[in-house]
Design a protein with these regions (language model features):
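Extended, basic/helix-rich recognition subdomains
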Residues: 155-212
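Aromatic-acidic/polar surface patches that form glycan- and anion
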Residues: 2, 165-172, 229, 233
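Helical scaffold of the NTase/Pol beta-like nucleotidyltransferase catalytic core
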Residues: 1-25, 54-56, 248, 252
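Conserved NTP/Mg2+-binding pocket subregion across the NTase superfamily
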Residues: 61-166, 173
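Catalytic metal-binding acidic patch
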Residues: 24-65, 72-80
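Structured mid-to-C-terminal alpha-helical surface segments
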Residues: 187-252
Length: 252
């Protein structure tokens, strides 16, 4: 557990959210085989009551000081327990902080509560990781996500994911591999472990692209795609999508 990275968030969260906090949980790469060079610190906060606009503003201002730059990026999500327990789909995300939204934050655009299918796999990972930073085990606060809702959620995000293929190539390819892996096996794996699984099953012509994405993720290669390799990115992504759609079409 990356204690220094995650623990430094606790005073900030307690100061801003106070007694509304029910639990704070580590998840993501830190609990799926360990942090990689490009990994975020992923934290979920479960609260009693919805955050106020003032609290969301304060969270953004404080998180921008400690996330990114010389420190690891932070992805922090707040959910109201009553919005996710009892479980219903799609769940509501009360607050989201991620470095990809920094430009919005700097323009004064605050995150607002909204439905978020992505919470289905996230809450599943939180429950599996069972890594509280504060509060009881997550199973005492969260209901399990039904498998059908998990499958629906991870497929729902594919079209939006594809719009980022040229700008966030590594992450998109690894995420597609993880979606395929999860649909096929029912297990949520780290991105590099999902890539390992997919590489053993992909046609040979698509393996170099995914292998390169995996190597960048692990810090074994620079974030650079040569012209020849980049021309093969779209065909590889299309193949992964066809494999995902094939499983989806067979699911009742």
């Amino acid at each position: 557990m990356p204690a220094p990275d995650a623990q430094r968030l606790l005073p900030l969260l307690h100061h801003t959210l106070g007694d509304s906090i029910l639990g704070i949980y580590l998840h993501g790469s830190a609990t799926l085989g360990g942090l990689r060079p490009h990994s975020d610190i992923d934290v979920l906060v479960v609260v009693r009551e919805p955050t106020t606009r003032a609290q969301r503003h304060a969270l953004v201002q404080e998180l921008m000081k400690v996330s990114g730059g010389a420190s690891r990026p932070v992805e922090l999500i707040v959910v109201v327990q009553g919005d996710v327990r009892p479980w219903r789909y799609p769940p509501t995300c009360d607050f989201l902080y991620g470095e990809w939204l920094r430009a919005d934050y700097e323009r004064g655009v605050p995150p607002a509560p909204e439905p978020s299918p992505d919470l289905a796999p996230l809450l599943t990972m939180v429950l599996l990781a069972n890594a509280p930073l504060h509060g009881p085990p997550p199973a005492e606060l969260l209901d399990p996500v039904p498998p059908a809702d998990l499958r629906r959620a991870i497929v729902t995000g594919v079209p939006e994911l594809l719009t980022e293929l040229d700008s966030d190539t590594r992450n998109v390819l690894l995420t597609l591999a993880r979606i395929w892996t999860t649909l096929e096996t029912g297990a949520i794996r780290s991105k590099d472990a999902a890539a390992d699984w997919a590489l053993a099953r992909l046609p040979a012509e698509h393996r170099p692209v995914l292998a390169h994405a995996r190597a960048i993720y692990l810090g074994e290669r620079d974030e650079h795609w040569g012209e020849d390799l980049f021309t093969r990115v779209r065909p590889c992504a299309d193949r992964l999508i066809r494999l995902i759609r094939a499983i989806e079409s067979q699911t009742p």
